[in-house]
């Protein structure tokens, strides 16, 4: 909502996040820092990513909200896919007209795009030295996008990697 900047500055007085950027923040909970990633999608929408317990995080974030600001848990409404590797930009370029040049869409950037005609939240979020895109799509489109990526990815020798592969 319109008070999204107020939430960000309440969480961290020094935090500034422009549209399309992803920043790391620590929220204190009983003097324990909770790491979140704040992804500013538009002037009035942000995506918060964390590996912390969802219900506890929502409860904690609600402490920062004014009555007219809404926090919506979209965890179960989206499928997350990750494309890791040196050819991922080439593969994604087959599915969108958006320029994904690394100089224009750097790591720790986000935007909404159409991939294979599907509204997608695209995060460029490198893992150490590995190029990594995280794709968030409505759950009902997850399997379709997965199959499209695997099919088009054959020329790039794409391989499925389970969650354990992140470690």
Positions of PLM-derived features:
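Basic, glycine/lysine-rich polyanion-binding surfaces/domains
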Residues: 1-167
């Amino acid at each position: 909502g319109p008070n999204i900047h107020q939430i960000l500055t309440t969480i961290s007085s020094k935090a500034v996040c422009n549209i399309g950027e992803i920043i790391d923040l620590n929220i204190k909970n009983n003097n324990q820092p909770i790491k979140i990633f704040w992804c500013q999608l538009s002037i009035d929408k942000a995506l918060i990513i964390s590996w912390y317990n969802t219900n506890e995080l929502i409860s904690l974030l609600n402490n920062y909200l004014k009555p007219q600001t809404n926090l919506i848990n979209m965890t179960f409404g989206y499928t997350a896919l990750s494309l890791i590797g040196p050819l991922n930009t080439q593969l994604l370029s087959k599915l969108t007209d958006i320029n994904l040049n690394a100089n224009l869409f750097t790591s720790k950037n986000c935007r909404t795009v159409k991939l294979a005609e599907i509204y997608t939240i695209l995060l460029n979020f490198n893992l150490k030295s590995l190029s990594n895109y995280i794709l968030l799509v409505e759950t009902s489109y997850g399997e379709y996008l997965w199959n499209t990526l695997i099919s088009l990815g054959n020329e790039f020798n794409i391989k499925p990697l389970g969650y354990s592969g992140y470690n």
